[in-house]
Amino acid sequence: MYDNLKSLGITNPEEIDRYSLRQEANNDILKIYFQKDKGEFFAKRVKFKYPRQRKTVVADGVGQGYKEVQEISPNLRYIIDELDQICQRDRSEVDLKRKILDDLRHLESVVTNKISEIEADLEKLTRK
């Protein structure tokens, strides 16, 4: 699993926190950030540079004109797919944790209100 990331020398893909991708001249710059260890100020990161793929395509369907376009490298595309899987998984785990905490807070509120209601009913019974 994560063969493309491992081919970059990333031995523990599960430690990836996030990534950034930007275009600089004729290259794509990929930075991969790892989770910080306790006591570290900055997260460890690695940087990779990929040349953009050049293609010549027909400029329009009518004439004989051609134009050159640049695209992301196919290898980089596969790496981004793997990074998205890792980062989406982390995001969904955080969302699930937030949902569970919200459910607990709601349950706590419902139970507190029910206890107050029962205590009020008991108070009415003891007054008679």
Swiss-Prot record:
It holds the Pfam family DUF3461. It comes from the Bacteria. InterPro entries: UPF0325. Belongs to the UPF0325 family. This is UPF0325 protein YaeH.
